[in-house]
Design a protein with these regions (language model features):
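Generic internal hydrophobic packing segments that stabilize the cores of diverse globular domains
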Residues: 60-68, 83-87, 105
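A short coil-to-beta-strand element that immediately follows conserved catalytic motifs
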Residues: 75-85
Length: 108
C-alpha cells in the first residue's frame, strides 16, 4: 500500500444501504423543477445559493456525517470542509467539458 507520512493513500467506504439512499436522493432531486444548463439535462449548479435543496439535507444527515467520521479517522485528522454540493443529471448526448474546481479534491 502506498503511504504518505505513514497515512495510507487508499480509502474505501461502502455506504450502508446505498441503494435505498440512491433511490431517495434521486426522488428528492426530481422535486427540483427541470433546469437545463449548457448541455446538461438537469442540474442545480446554477440555481441561487438560497434555493431549497432537500436532497442535500438528506445527504448531509444520512450519508456524509458517517463518511466524514470514517475518512477523518483514516487520515488521523479532526477537521475537513465541505464547500458546496450540486448534482448533474445527464441524459443521452449530454456532456460537460473537462474542467477542474478549486478546493475540490474528489467527487463521485
Amino acid at each position: 500500500m502506498i503511504t504518505l507520512n505513514n497515512i495510507p493513500l487508499s480509502f474505501l467506504y461502502d455506504v450502508p444501504k446505498a441503494v435505498d439512499h440512491k433511490n431517495i436522493i434521486l426522488n428528492l432531486i426530481q422535486k427540483i423543477p427541470p433546469n437545463k444548463y449548457n448541455a446538461i439535462s438537469h442540474t442545480d449548479v446554477n440555481l441561487p445559493e438560497g434555493f431549497h435543496r432537500e436532497y442535500t439535507i438528506y445527504f448531509l444527515k444520512n450519508i456524509y456525517q458517517q463518511f466524514k467520521q470514517k475518512f477523518l479517522e483514516h487520515l488521523g485528522e479532526t477537521h475537513m470542509d465541505l464547500h458546496n454540493i450540486w448534482f448533474q443529471w445527464y441524459n443521452q448526448n449530454d456532456y460537460h467539458p473537462w474542467h477542474v474546481h478549486p478546493w475540490c479534491h474528489f467527487t463521485n
